[in-house]
Amino acid sequence: MYADRDLPGAGGLAVRVIPCLDVDDGRVVKGVNFENLRDAGDPVELAAVYDAEGADELTFLDVTASSSGRATMLEVVRRTAEQVFIPLTVGGGVRTVADVDSLLRAGADKVAVNTAAIACLDLLADMARQFGSQCIVLSVDARTVPVGSAPTPSGWEVTTHGGRRGTGMDAVQWAARGADLGVGEILLNSMDADGTKAGFDLALLRAVRAAVTVPVIASGGAGAVEHFAPAVAAGADAVLAASVFHFRELTIGQVKAALAAEGITVR
């Protein structure tokens, strides 16, 4: 049992369970396997299903936006906000303060920033100042520094373009810098664990948890209900998954039940 630990969900704030929808040109990718849906690739319809199943929040990531220069899908956000009333975070292709403004006006509650913040350090501070820290999420795609590359202090580096490009920036230091600049939470995605279904990167979570005081969302690696409580024990305030939910390998309810069985508070 984890309940006696000083960790999220142990008698404190409830740990959030967040499905992530990767969206390409307005369609959910990575596949979905819901029965009784008219269109299993429609993000709005999927969002409504997850809302009904008890998801605490939703995250939309435009997986093509940063690498191909597409603007984020405002119309999808508008349609979702009209039907779904849990918090919605949107990321992908967010480059300017104006982009954040457009997404918030369309109905997003929070906006995740990744590549653009690396290119312009002032951007996070400007966004937090204008819209409030609670609206700004720093998305960190971290991987173990490849053999032959210059090492970083923590052993992890920040990547961009869906993990395809290394930056040489230390991932833990970058998360801490983002918190200092005013972001309200860190979306920490392990590119090493992503897609493996072997569990979250607990060492990475512990390292970032020790470096920041803002909430941390664990992402990358979820494959079984047993994987979620250790992520919380390692410091996650929220747990995010995509394909295990989309393919019905796990449900929101099963994950919450597994967390509750370990003494972790859920909604």
UniProtKB/Swiss-Prot annotation:
UniProt xrefs under CDD domains: HisF
Catalysis: reaction(s): 5-[(5-phospho-1-deoxy-D-ribulos-1-ylimino)methylamino]-1-(5-phospho-beta-D-ribosyl)imidazole-4-carboxamide + L-glutamine = D-erythro-1-(imidazol-4-yl)glycerol 3-phosphate + 5-amino-1-(5-phospho-beta-D-ribosyl)imidazole-4-carboxamide + L-glutamate + H(+)
Any one GO MF annotation of this record: imidazoleglycerol-phosphate synthase activity
Extent of the signal sequence: none
E.C. code: 4.3.2.10
Pathway: Amino-acid biosynthesis; L-histidine biosynthesis; L-histidine from 5-phospho-alpha-D-ribose 1-diphosphate: step 5/9
Main location: cytoplasm
UniProt similarity note: Belongs to the HisA/HisF family.
Protein name: Imidazole glycerol phosphate synthase subunit HisF
Organism name: Mycobacterium bovis (strain ATCC BAA-935 / AF2122/97)
Lineage: Bacteria, Bacillati, Actinomycetota, Actinomycetes, Mycobacteriales
